[in-house]
A protein has these predicted regions:
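An N-terminal domain-start capping segment
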Residues: 17, 21, 138-144, 189
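Membrane-anchoring hydrophobic helices of lipid-metabolizing enzymes
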Residues: 1-113, 118, 148-149, 153-154, ...
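Non-catalytic C-terminal accessory region of glycerolipid acyltransferases
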Residues: 53, 60-63, 128, 132, ...
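Residue-level marker for well-ordered alpha-helical positions
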Residues: 40, 120, 148-149, 170, ...
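Residues that cap or flank secondary-structure elements
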Residues: 34, 90-91, 143, 164, ...
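Alpha-helical segments flanking ligand/cofactor-binding loops in enzyme cores
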Residues: 100, 124, 215-216
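Short capping/connector residues at structural and topological boundaries
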Residues: 85, 92, 96-98, 121, ...
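Catalytic core of membrane glycerolipid acyltransferases/transacylases, capturing the structured
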Residues: 105-166, 193-202
Length: 304
C-alpha cells in the first residue's frame, strides 16, 4: 500500500509549481465549500483569539487560511522531488551565518517554532549550511503508519533528519560524541496532555497549557536557542530568520525560554494570522478544569 501511495504523490510532485497551485485552488473549493473541513473549529479559534476583529475580518482570515492550508499540502508534497536549485530560489535563509558561527564556536543549536507557515520546509534549511552539519526536525509520529512513513520520506528528501520526539536525546548525545554539529527544530506549540501540564501562559487571548520538555532538553544540552520565524512574501516563496533567545540557556530563569518563544510566535501570528494552523482544538483544556481535577505534587500532575 505504501509503495502505491508514494508512487502517486511522487508523480504528483513532478508537476511544475504553477500546475500544483491550480490543483491547490481546486482543493480549496473542496475542503472549504464542499467538505467544510473543521470550519467550526477554525471559526471558534479565530473568534476567541481575536475578539477585537469584526466578523468580516475574521471571515476574510478564515478564507485566506483555507487557501494557504491547501497550498501547504501541495508544497509539502513537492518536497518529494524538488531540486536543491529550485528550493534555494523559493526558501531564503536570511541569517544562517549566525548558526554557523555557533557551530564554529563548538556549540550546537536548537530552533524553536510553531505550526506557522510551511514548517515542513524547515527540514531543508541545511541547503544554506555546510553539508557535514546535521539539520533535522523533531516530530510526533502519526498513528497511520503509511502516512507517517510518507511524511518521514518528504522530510528527509533534501538532507533533513526527521527524529521522533521520544528519541531526540539519543540523537543529540550521539552527534555530540561524534563531534558532529547539529541544529534541530522543535515544534513547541502543541497542546499537552493533562499529566504533562506544568505551565500556563497567555497566548492569543487564552490561558494556554504549554509543553516545557523542549526547554529542559535545550538546558540539558546547553544549546544556543533561536526562535525560527518563517514568512511568506508571496505564494510559493518563504523566508526563514533566526532570532536569538539565548546562547546560555542554563543561566536563564526556569520557563523563560518558553515564555519568550510564545511571545514571539504570537507576534508572528498577529502579523499574518492566516498562516497559523487553526484546525486543531488548541484550547480544549482549560485552567479552570485543570485546577478542579488535578494538583501538582513533587513536580508531578496527579488527580485530586
Amino acid at each position: 500500500m505504501y509503495r502505491l501511495i508514494y508512487a502517486f504523490f511522487y508523480t504528483l510532485s513532478l508537476l511544475p509549481m504553477w500546475c500544483l497551485y491550480r490543483l491547490s485552488d481546486m482543493g480549496f473549493v473542496l475542503i472549504y465549500y464542499i467538505l467544510r473541513y473543521r470550519r467550526n473549529v477554525v471559526k471558534s479559534n479565530l473568534t476567541s483569539s481575536f475578539p477585537e476583529k469584526s466578523q468580516e475580518e475574521l471571515k476574510a482570515i478564515e478564507r485566506k487560511f483555507y487557501r494557504w492550508f491547501a497550498d501547504y499540502f501541495i508544497e509539502s508534497v513537492k518536497l518529494l522531488s524538488i531540486s536543491k536549485e529550485e528550493l534555494s530560489k523559493r526558501l531564503t535563509i536570511i541569517n544562517a551565518n549566525h548558526i554557523e558561527e555557533c557551530f564554529k564556536e563548538g556549540q550546537d543549536c536548537a530552533g524553536i517554532l510553531g505550526h506557522y507557515c510551511n514548517w515542513e520546509w524547515l527540514s531543508c534549511i541545511g541547503i544554506s549550511l555546510p553539508s557535514d552539519r546535521k539539520i533535522g526536525l523533531i516530530y510526533k509520529p502519526i498513528r497511520n503508519k503509511t502516512i507517517d512513513k510518507l511524511f518521514y520520506q518528504l522530510r528527509s528528501c533534501v538532507g533533513g533528519v526527521p527524529v521522533p520526539k521520544n528519541e531526540i536525546l539519543r540523537y543529540l548525545v550521539q552527534y555530540r560524541k561524534e563531534g558532529v554539529r547539529s541544529l534541530f527544530g522543535y515544534i513547541s506549540d502543541q497542546s499537552p496532555r493533562w499529566q504533562n501540564i506544568h505551565l500556563w501562559l497567555p497566548f492569543l487571548n487564552h490561558e494556554t497549557p504549554v509543553f516545557t520538555g523542549t526547554e529542559r532538553i535545550m538546558r540539558k544540552m546547553n544549546n544556543a536557542v533561536y526562535y525560527v520565524e518563517m514568512n511568506r512574501p508571496k505564494r510559493g516563496y518563504y523566508t526563514c530568520e533566526f532570532h536569538l533567545i539565548t546562547k546560555d540557556p542554563q543561566s536563564m530563569p526556569e520557563h523563560e525560554i518558553t515564555r519568550q518563544f510564545f511571545k514571539m510566535l504570537e507576534q508572528s501570528i498577529k502579523n499574518q494570522p492566516h498562516l497559523y494552523l487553526w484546525t486543531h482544538k488548541r484550547w480544549k483544556r482549560t485552567k479552570e478544569e485543570f485546577d478542579s481535577r488535578f494538583i501538582i505534587e513533587n513536580g508531578k500532575v496527579v488527580p485530586k
